[in-house]
From Swiss-Prot:
It is a multi-pass membrane protein. One of its GO terms (biological process) is phosphatidylcholine biosynthetic process. The gene is CHO2. It comes from Laccaria bicolor (strain S238N-H82 / ATCC MYA-4686) (Bicoloured deceiver). It comes from the Eukaryota. The keyword Transferase applies. This is Phosphatidylethanolamine N-methyltransferase.
Length: 909
């Protein structure tokens, strides 16, 4: 598991630089004794001393809160039931009772902690309910204050501490109830399943060993938990980092023993108790509970920790052996590797992108256009098929081999043909590798071409070999050795078949002799460095397309085997090859070589020159190849024309309608909800207006520029009102919105919403105000990241009733007048900061020892924005990983220039 996922309760507080800088005026002796915390809002406070749950719950010297009394009552309830219930009933009850508390822990706490981490949900709920507000809920506040004050020490002051800390103290009391009851209910279930084995005297030594091992595991479990608590303290034990900040994370103590010791070796006691109980039921319940705890780790705890302590990309222009003030103290072995001397000052970011480029891990990052990935999938598929293929009859096996050969035939000629056709028209393969993989700036743009062609060669050769091998498989399954070669046409069939196979081999060898590896692998579809002229030598002196003779072996094998399946396979292969030549290779040759292509093959010219009296015969000879193709094409065209006359208009209409629906489907995936009380509101009193851009002074905004909207509404307007941005023309109605905003919306009272859920806070009514106004600013993910014209709509009560509209506003992007390095870089200097939310920490131009063109990312969305902007400005596609790998304006500008040069080469040919 990666380091970003290994923070669970591995938290040892360490002084934060920012916190220390704010506390420089603190007297020196106090700094060593006092622990300081910091809220998300920046408020610094002294963290009081807390006590562990065992001490506060069972030590009579400590006062008990009402929640402590509830906890003790539940514990006593379990003990009483254990002694009064029959053994079988006790087992069933405590099984479900433990499942309840385990679910409350893993699912309940997981859900609550996730919402608190993302949206500060617990704190906001306390605010919404007014539990700690002296004016709104004084009785509840005083009760909570007493509960917390009784549990804390003398250094605790309820009124002096921030809301986040007091909310955390209240939260941890609820957590104590869950944790303690979860533990005891498991123990009660295990004890109810305990039995003394029969034949104790015979198996005494074995049982004693089992019990001894169980007690050792329990003791080890207790030691791990105790040591872990000593390291992380209550702050880490009760997930304090989702409420406030108390320091950075380091690894220490028991956390060097095993990964996630609290959730791995920290559950050894489960298996110790299973050994002592000697029950498979306890063992399987332990395994299920342990698995649920790991699910809690993976799905609930790791994501917020990773989001809090790790950025997606940090492009640091430092030598890899330089010391780093990171947020995490590394493992000693890792640290020794990092600190080893290097000859060059290459950053770790650059090294990672140099040696690792979307590598396949199991099946993650799979790319079937990479030859190694395609071969991996084939090996896995064939291995699975061999392993799970049942015993089949000879007839079924023959049909399976035929389908196998047919599939490879279609993959080779049609599948690869379509890829090659796309490469000829749009440089599809080169674009794919250029978009998804990072290449060094020093390769002059050739890296993508070389890799695309290298992978194409491997895939093409693999496909061609599998085409022949699969065909031979069908022949082998259908062939039977003749009993008498002199009877019938057996000898003739084998002779003609062998001759056709020999003709195929000769034609292929002659073709390769003329074409070489460049022509054999269709190099002119990829590379422009080679000369663009044709030489008709060898077999090409006589035939324009000797590849047409390549199917001779298939017909020869059909003769030899005498199988209709092989014959049909040969015909299908012949038609597929004809389609490939006429639709893929010949159009590309005409585009590339133009008039230098000859019309007649060599042997046709000879017949035309030396036998004019046999002109009609010559046409028939020429038709041996070309005419067959033409007649087949005419037949297919006639068939399609007949189909088109009967159903063509309807099919075209359906296709066109489908395209339109698909284009609008994302926007229209919304169930329009309208308000029933709309008649009680006067829409004329609502007003929304677009503030002009600070850059242009008009309603035109650069892509990524924040858009400010002013609104005015009656004082009694709903607190759930919201404003959305929509493409002009997306909604036909001006009274009801029927398309999705695609995330481009904001509530008019953002402080009263938890993400997309209104908190339902009540406002204090005012008799003097008739209207209320405010401002919302669209930025980041709420902005449209596609150029075009948009309109603003003010909606009522969380529904889709439109109260006011304004627009249009235009989203534009400046395109450089010429494709030079300076113009491209200047465009990026404007685009990139806007895509990074204009966060100065992500573009540290003045940071020490840093390339001034470097930039960083907080989220993958920012990298996607840059990709979208580059596509709209320069018409070049990049995957987010490529932009993250560069993370530098100069590098990105060079990449764009090289890409444009590669993609524009011969575009007008």
């Amino acid at each position: 598991m990666t380091s970003s996922q290994s923070f669970l309760r591995q938290r040892k507080p360490q002084a934060n630089d920012e916190t220390e800088s704010e506390l420089h005026n603190t007297p020196e002796p106090t700094k060593q004794d006092v622990v300081w915390g910091k809220t998300p809002g920046g408020e610094v406070f002294r963290v009081p001393t807390t006590h562990d749950v065992i001490t506060t719950l069972f030590n009579p010297r400590y006062k008990k809160s009402h929640l402590d009394l509830l906890n003790l009552t539940l514990l006593g309830f379990q003990l009483v039931l254990f002694f009064i219930l029959p053994r079988r009933a006790s087992q069933i009850f405590f099984l479900f009772y433990f499942a309840f508390w385990r679910g409350a822990y893993d699912a309940g706490l997981g859900w609550v902690l996730t919402k608190q981490s993302k949206k500060k949900w617990i704190v906001r709920e306390v605010q919404r309910l007014g539990w700690l507000d002296e004016k709104r809920r004084p009785a509840v506040r005083n009760w909570i204050r007493k509960q917390l004050a009784d549990k804390m020490g003398k250094d605790y002051s309820f009124d002096d501490l921030p809301l986040e800390y007091n909310t955390w103290l209240l939260f941890r009391q609820a957590v104590d109830v869950i944790l303690v009851n979860d533990f005891l209910s498991y123990c009660m279930f295990a004890f109810s399943c305990f039995r003394v084995p029969e034949g104790l005297s015979v198996l005494a030594l074995l049982i004693l060993r089992r019990w001894l091992g169980g007690f050792l595991l329990i003791a080890f479990n207790l030691w791990v938990k105790t040591e872990a608590h000593n390291v992380v303290k209550d702050y880490g034990w009760y997930w304090g980092d989702v409420f406030f900040q108390r320091g950075n994370l380091v690894f220490d103590g028991v956390f060097e023993l095993a990964p996630h010791p609290m959730y791995s070796v920290g559950y050894a006691g489960y298996y110790g108790l299973s050994l002592i109980a000697g029950s498979y039921a306890v063992l399987f319940v332990s395994l299920a509970a342990h698995a649920a705890q790991f699910a809690f780790l993976v799905f609930f705890e790791n994501p917020p920790v990773a989001a809090s302590y790790k950025k997606i990309s940090r492009h640091v222009s430092q030598p890899s052996n330089a010391s780093s003030n990171g947020d995490i103290e590394m493992d000693p072995n890792t640290r020794s590797l990092i600190s080893s001397p290097r000859k060059s000052a290459t950053s770790q970011h650059d090294l990672l992108n140099k040696y690792f480029r979307r590598d396949v891990v199991v099946l993650r990052n799979l790319d079937l256009l990479r030859s190694t990935d395609a071969m991996l999938v084939l090996i896995i598929a064939y291995a699975l098929m061999i392993s799970f293929l049942p015993t089949l009859s000879a007839r079924t096996m023959l049909a399976l081999h035929f389908l196998h050969a047919l599939a490879w035939c279609m993959i080779h000629y049609v599948g690869l043909g379509l890829i090659l056709q796309a490469q000829s028209k749009t440089k599809f393969l080169v674009r794919h590798f250029m978009k998804n993989y990072h290449y060094s700036q020093n390769d002059g743009g050739g890296g993508a071409i070389v890799e695309a062609f290298t992978n194409w060669k491997a895939i093409y050769n693999l496909s061609m070999c599998m085409t022949y091998v699969s065909c031979v498989g069908v022949v082998w399954k259908s062939y039977s050795l003749p009993h008498d070669w002199t009877v019938g046409n057996e000898l003739l069939r084998h002779t003609l078949g062998a001759l056709l196979v020999g003709l195929h081999v000769w034609a292929s060898m002659e073709s390769f002799e003329v074409l070489g590896v460049f022509g054999w692998f269709f190099g002119d579809f990829f590379m422009e460095e080679f000369p663009t002229h044709l030489e008709y030598t060898g077999i090409y002196r006589y035939l324009n397309n000797p590849e047409a003779m390549g199917g001779a072996a298939w017909f020869g094998l059909a003769l030899i085997s005498g199988s209709k399946l092989v014959l049909s396979l040969a015909v299908i292969r012949h038609l597929a090859n004809w389609w490939f030549l006429s639709s893929v290779e010949n159009p590309h040759m005409r585009k590339l070589y133009g008039d230098s292509l000859r019309k007649d093959a060599g042997f046709v010219k000879v017949i035309k020159n030396h036998a004019p009296e046999l002109k009609r015969v010559a046409r028939e000879v020429k038709g041996t190849f070309d005419k067959v193709f033409e007649e087949t094409a005419d037949a297919v065209e006639d068939f399609l024309a007949k189909c088109e006359r009967s159903s063509g208009p309807r099919i075209s209409e359906v296709v066109q309608e489908t395209k339109v629906l698909l284009q609008q489907s994302r926007e229209r995936l919304v169930i329009t909800r309208v308000s029933n009380d709309i008649s009680a509101y006067d829409s004329s009193k609502y007003h929304v207006s677009i503030s002009p851009s600070s850059l242009t002074g008009e309603r035109t905004f650069h892509l990524g520029e924040p858009i400010t909207i002013k609104w005015q509404a009656p004082h009694k307007h709903s607190r759930k009102d919201w404003i959305g941005l929509y493409r002009v023309g997306a909604n036909k109605s001006n009274t009801v919105t029927k398309t999705s905003s695609m995330g481009m919306w904001l509530p008019v009272h953002g402080e009263e919403w938890d993400g997309d859920v209104p908190l339902g806070l009540k406002r204090v009514p005012s008799k003097h105000l008739e209207s209320e106004n405010g401002v919302v600013t669209f930025k980041g993910n709420t902005l449209p990241w596609l150029v075009g014209h948009y309109e603003v709509r003010y909606h009522h009560d969380g529904k889709y009733n439109v109260m006011s509209m304004d627009g249009p506003l235009e989203i534009f992007v400046d395109k450089p007048s010429d494709m030079t390095f300076s113009s491209v870089r200047n465009s990026l200097m404007r685009i990139v900061p806007l895509c990074l939310d204009s966060d100065p920490s992500l573009i540290p131009f003045s940071c020490k020892d840093r390339d001034p063109d470097d930039f960083s990312f907080w989220s993958e969305h920012q990298a996607k924005r840059i990709c979208a902007a580059i596509k709209q400005v320069f018409n070049v596609d990049y995957a987010p990983e490529v932009v993250v790998a560069d993370a530098n304006l100069t590098a990105l500008a060079n990449r764009i220039l090289i890409s444009k040069e590669i993609l524009s080469t011969r575009s007008d040919t």
